[in-house]
Amino acid sequence: LYLDKIVQSHRDVASRDQRNLDDLVGQACALSSTRGFAEQLVQGSRENLCVIAEIKRKSPSKGVLHANLDAAHIASLYEQGGASCLSVLTDEHFFGGSVEDLQIARASTSLPVIRKDFTVSEFDVVDARLMGADCVLLIAAALSDDELSRFHDLAVHIDLEVLVETHDEHELERALNVGANIVGVNQRDLITFEVDHARAERMASLIPPTVVRVAESGVRNADDARRLRDAGYDAVLVGESIVTSSDPVAAVRDLKVA
């Protein structure tokens, strides 16, 4: 399975990490405050659907999306288009991302940034904060209840926001149980890669109004965006359709439906 293979490779790396976690947590706690990720989405969604614009060079399912992507340039185009936040892939092996991409993108805009990666250990959580991310991704399908809870609490402790990604009602329940205040609903089935718009629309109504609702994957155009906005989503996380666009500014702007 696609997700299992990626997660296992990340777990293998994490198991060999010899660093002292307490030292790293201390360093993270000493950093200056982050840019408010949830707050940006809460404010923006009062006016229109927010766009979390993703910097993604390639993916296992689609191959190369944007070979010689300039992270600083595309980040500033996303900001010009009205993106509320950035999402940056830092997985090198499967997605061609890097820590450097995240740092460059964040430095070239004023937007909050989520580290998009496969978080499988406490080290991954703390590393996200140390590299400059404002928010970290936790994928419910990849983690046990204990891990989800521990990683979420550690992130909160080091002033790092958390987006918990879910795929179905059971995972949504798990996300809410750990106190997630930003929940993503991934419309793409991780096994078949098919996009299920109906499930995302159905799940929106199950997310409490105090929680920021983000729809992920399979958002291709303004019609998709409008349907998700009508279903109750505050934001869409979009990568492929804007990173491959000849005009990323317009592509982002088009998704910001009122």
Language model segments and positions:
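C-terminal helical cap(s) of enzyme catalytic domains, especially alpha/beta-barrels
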Residues: R202-L206, T244-A258
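N-terminal active-site wall of soluble small-molecule enzyme domains
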Residues: L49-C50, I55, K62-L163, E169-R174, ...
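Glycine-rich phosphate-binding active-site loops on the catalytic face of alpha/beta enzymes
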Residues: D127-E147, G184-F193, Y233-A251
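Catalytic-face loop-and-helix region of soluble metabolic enzyme cores
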Residues: I182-V238
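Catalytic cores of alpha/beta
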Residues: V120-M131, H167-V178, A215, V219-V238, ...
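Conserved SAM-binding loop
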Residues: D117, V164-E165, V185, T244
